[in-house]
Structure formats: structure tokens, C-alpha cells
Amino acid sequence: MHFIDEVKIYIKGGNGGNGCISFHREKFIDRGGPDGGDGGFGGSVIFRSNHHINTLVNYRYQQHFTAENGENGKGSNRSGKSGKSLILDVPVGTQIFSQDGDILLYDFTEDEKSFEIIKGGCGGLGNSHFKTSVNQAPRKSTEGEIAEEMWIHLRLKLLSDVGLIGLPNAGKSTFLSVVTAAKPKIADYPFTTLVPNLGVVYIDDEEFVIADIPGLIAGAHQGYGLGDKFLKHIERCNVLIHLIDGASNNVIADYNTVRFELESYSDYLKNKIEIICLNKCDVLVDEEIQKKIKKLQKVTNKVVHPISTYNNQGVNKIVKLALEIIKNQKY
């Protein structure tokens, strides 16, 4: 399935049915009174969050959605049938924005939440409403209300507790596969991960969601590489796990590149709690590991954890640390 996280769609509510002009007809009654029924209400447009959906791909190719119109009123004071509301399911984490993309209309942060974005048009009035003492046979009714229509933007921000960040090929996908049941595509070349991958970590009777965000490169916040498209998905995370390739010749530059992209994208990302991990320590001798850790700690003023996703060295410790941070932030 294609991962689609932003679409623009057109939506319209159902129009109300027209009121009816009708007169009572019955044997032996020459002039029956007005009995035109009202038009039915038009259907509304309702968005609903659904955790079984994880992409906006259903809105990629069909972009026009209209609720059902109400039926016209009928004789014998029978109202028209109301139109069916249109329910559009979206993934949890979807945000609805105005046509210009500037105004947030709704943010689905929980499952099975509904948002009525357009109300269906009211039905028109039948001629029975217009009977007066001086006009016993009104030939007047009203048309149904024309429902609102609009273009909107749907944007998906994944809901995860932990975001995995780092340059391409830093070992993020391997980390995800080791700590969860997720099976991301993994290979020894940059940009293996082309879409965010989600997995659930189970530890000590607790669980949390972790997202592997496609690799960042210099200039990601300006649209280079893949990072700009997916940086928004880590805005909701409680903590970031920053993996650095221990086999790199310049771990400081690698770290600074990713940090610069985060800080350039938003101040919100800049202040996220960060767990720094020097990965691929299985290919380094102890002296190299300590040398690179000291360099990183001097620049970051943070603890740097040596790990290896290849042989699972230190990974469980990182998972427990992330869980502790998540619990502290939530409670």
C-alpha cells in the first residue's frame, strides 16, 4: 500500500429537498386544503478517525465527495426522505485544514472520533405552511437549502511515542526490527526507508509506539532528500532516539547535520528530549568507541550510549530509558 500523508479534496453537503405544492384530493370534496409536505434534510459530511487505516491513499485518486440530497416533499403532507450523511474515515493523527492550508479545523488525536465539517441543507417548506385566513389555497413553497461546499487539506501526522532519527543508513530500520515486530525494508545503502515505519515495543508489561523516520540529509528542511516530507511525523513524539553511524569518519558532523535540520524545521522539534546512540559499535574496537563517545559528549553535553543493532548490544537499555521518559511525560 502506498503511504500518502497529504491530500487536497473537495467536499459538499447534500442539498435540502424542495417543499411541495399540493392540495388534498378526495371524493366528494371539491376544494381540499393545501397538503404539500416539506423537503427532506440533506446529508452532512462527517469525518471519522479509524485506527485500522494508516494512510490517506483512499483520497489520492478520488478527490470529490458529496453527501446525498434530501428528497422533495410530497402530497398528503408527506415529507421528503432525508439524504444519507457521508462518513469519510481517516487515520488517527489526521489534521483537517482550510483550503489555503492556514487554518486548522480539526485534529484527530484519538480513535473513533467524529467531526461534522458540513451540515446538510434544510428542507424547503410545503405549501401547507402558507395557508392563512385570507389565502386558503396557497400556491407557494420554498426550495431546499443549498449545502456548503469547500476544498480542504488533509494532513497526516503519525502518532508515535518515540521517533527514530539519524542520517541515511544509520541503522534506524534495523533498530526498529530488533525492538518490534515491524519488518521494514533493510539494506546497506542510503534511503532504504522511503516512508515512515511504525512498530509497537512491548516491555515489562508496557508498550509504546516507535516510528522510523526516513533518513535526513543536509538541507532536508528545505526539501532536499526525504526528510522535509516526514519531519512533521516526529512533532507528536515524546522522545527522539538519535542514531549515529559509529563507522562514520566524522560522527560530530553527522550529529550536527541532523540537529540543524530539526532546529531549522521548528523550535518544537529543537526542544524534544533526545537519546543519543552511537550505533554499529560491533565494528569498532573499544578505543575507537570511547574516543567517538567522548567527542560527541563534549559537543552535545549529553550522555552518549554505545549500541549495536547487529548483535543487540545496549538496545534493551535504550528501550527501557525511552519507556521511562514516556511515562514521566504522560503522568
Curated annotation (Swiss-Prot):
Occurrences of domain Obg (ranges): 1-159
CDD domains: Obg
Sequence positions that bind Mg(2+): S173, T193
Annotated localization: Cytoplasm
Keywords tagged on the record: Cytoplasm, GTP-binding, Hydrolase, Magnesium, Metal-binding, Nucleotide-binding
Gene3D superfamilies per record: GTP1/OBG domain, P-loop containing nucleotide triphosphate hydrolases
Annotated Pfam families: GTP1_OBG, MMR_HSR1
Record domain OBG-type G: where: 160-327
Keyword Nucleotide-binding: yes
Chief place of localization: cytoplasm
Superkingdom in the source lineage: Bacteria
GO CC, any one term: cytoplasm
Binding site for GTP: 166-173, 191-195, 212-215, 279-282, 308-310
GO biological process, alphabetically ordered: ribosome biogenesis
EC number: 3.6.5.-
InterPro entries: G_OBG, GTP-bd, GTP-bd_Obg/CgtA, GTP1_OBG_dom, GTP1_OBG_dom_sf, OBG_GTPase, P-loop_NTPase
Main enzyme class: hydrolase
GO MF entries: GTP binding; GTPase activity; magnesium ion binding
Entry cofactors: Mg(2+)
PROSITE patterns, per database record: G_OBG, OBG
NCBIfam families: Obg_CgtA, PRK12297.1, PRK12299.1
Description of how the protein assembles with itself and partners: Monomer.
UniProt cross-references to PANTHER family, sorted A to Z: DEVELOPMENTALLY REGULATED GTP-BINDING PROTEIN-RELATED (PTHR11702), MITOCHONDRIAL RIBOSOME-ASSOCIATED GTPASE 2 (PTHR11702:SF31)
Annotated family: Belongs to the TRAFAC class OBG-HflX-like GTPase superfamily. OBG GTPase family.
Function: An essential GTPase which binds GTP, GDP and possibly (p)ppGpp with moderate affinity, with high nucleotide exchange rates and a fairly low GTP hydrolysis rate. Plays a role in control of the cell cycle, stress response, ribosome biogenesis and in those bacteria that undergo differentiation, in morphogenesis control.
Protein name as it appears in the record: GTPase Obg
